[in-house]
Amino acid sequence: MTARVVISWKQSRDKLNLSMRILFLLFLSAVAGWSQDLVGLYLMWQSDPSTTMTINWVDLHTSSPLDVHYRRVGEAAWAKATGVKFAIADTTMQGRRVELKGLLPDTHYEFNIGKGIEKPAEGWRFRTMPRDLNRPVRFVTGGDMFSTRLKLDKANSNAASLDPDFALIVGDLAYANGVASNRWVEWLKSWMQAAVSPDGRVIPLVIGIGNHEVKGGYNGKIPDDAPFFYSLFTTPERRAYYALDFGDYLSILVLDTAHTNPIPGAQAEWLAKALAARKNKQFVFVGYHYPAYGTTKGPKGKTPLDAAHSIEIREHWMPSWEKYGVTAVFENDHHNYKRTHRLRQHKRDDTNGILYLGDGAWGVATRTVPEPGTAWWLAKAEGRNHVWEVKIRNNGTSTIRAIDIDGKEFDKVEVLTPRTKPVE
């Protein structure tokens, strides 16, 4: 009887030990295998782009590392920063985020998740922004990105090949409509894999919201009706409209065209104050999704200018940026290429007017544009996938180029003053 009891206990102990070993091996496998299951890695800024970088990564493991190891390229010693977890809508994806602070301006860094690296190819790289405009700064911008994964990869790779300091993408990223998590998985993978510069840098994102981030497209709630946008992306002001400042030389103002914040009211009041506070910034660009001066989608029997949101933008926002002057305005949503004439107070003004550039065709199918001469506000328009490349210089000039998805330049504007003349 005793022997049977001992054997039974021994068998139970062995089974328990085996179960513990299996669980331990599964845990190790999850930790070791998280990098193979990495869904996405993307960079953003929550504060000063010259001394900080926010690293975000998404995977499928609850036990993934929270640590980031980083160092200046060429240095031997690693620094470590520990991030935080965040939920991604109602999905099993696991998000982590860490903001690196105290970085040197205009400096290349290499980093990895969970450990240091032995070879540069094992990790990722980024570059901080310059504190002053002591070299030309270049960014790409557009919107309306994802139709097919193949086309998205091509468009992202094309944008990264221009070697931008960052990408300003304003709306309709994954076309998930606030519910389709599989679309976000593919979008995140594409950005991580394809949006890498020629020297191996991950391109930082400056993000705006569009109708396809929101359940219902417009007049959503915060953050309930845009759960992926608000969980994935953290902005300097923790909302879909905000300003990002680069020293004294550049400000980017990102707005929400009635997707989760109304155009009039609080947002319009904030815009007026933000522009007033930045009257001494050298360059100021404004970006948003739905256009004030579009190329399509007009109400039945009317022009794109007659769309309700277009009218609201011109009534509630345009007076503020005309009052203080801006470098240019970027619009999206209409799935075309467009450059307006210089416009001022809703009229053509080739001397003091503002350029409105768009119209959101990063990687989606394009639409029909008005016949030449039929839309008084348009200088040039066509159905063509593209990104805008912007280069600013310390002498106050900038070059803005339209680059199609095959890498061909097909339009260019030389802007000789940093900001338009303010309306008195």
Where are these regions (language model features)?
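Ala/Thr-enriched low-complexity intrinsically disordered regions
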Residues: 2-3, 30
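Local alpha-helix boundary/kink/capping signal
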Residues: 8-9, 297
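Bacterial N-terminal signal peptides that target proteins for export
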Residues: 9-23
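Sec-dependent N-terminal signal peptides
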Residues: 22-31
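Boundary at the C-terminal end of the N-terminal hydrophobic targeting segment
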Residues: 33-35
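Metal-dependent phosphoester/phosphodiester hydrolase catalytic core
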Residues: 37-370, 377-381, 389-424
